[in-house]
Amino acid sequence: MKNMNKILGLALMVFSAFSCTAQLNPVSWSFSATKVADKTYEVKMVATMQTNWHLYSQKQPEDAIAIPTAFTFSPNPLFKLDDNIKEIGKMEVMKDPTLGVSANQYSKTVTFVQRIKLKANVKTSFNGNVEYQTCDDKKCLPPKTVNFSVAIK
């Protein structure tokens, strides 16, 4: 009976650890597309962070150790990418004098916008993924990848 209690106690600790880790998801993403001109769309990728959490910009200073947010788009012969991804939000420059590093980051929300131009008036989808790292003032979580698909109508 003592062995059974030890096993149950150990199992409870293991599952509790997984449960706590699974709850740490401080960034939520939404994806949408808006027609802005004939055959031209803006795909918006919006990150919303929980209080005290930060998401890093695509562009980081040379002394940064933060992992920048990066997007990968699936090739699609029906459209071409038009310009680079724009970031819309209040960028903060974080400086840590103890470590001698800095980072470009966002709190609360940031919108990434990629313009695309269709080669013809067709329905298609814009697929890809975003890899990002998020931190609060005490810890950073490992990089995470989120896949997405946005209908282009």
For the regions a language model picked out, list residue spans one by one:
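Bacterial Sec-dependent N-terminal signal peptides
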Residues: 1-25
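Extracellular/lumen-exposed scaffold segments
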Residues: 21-153
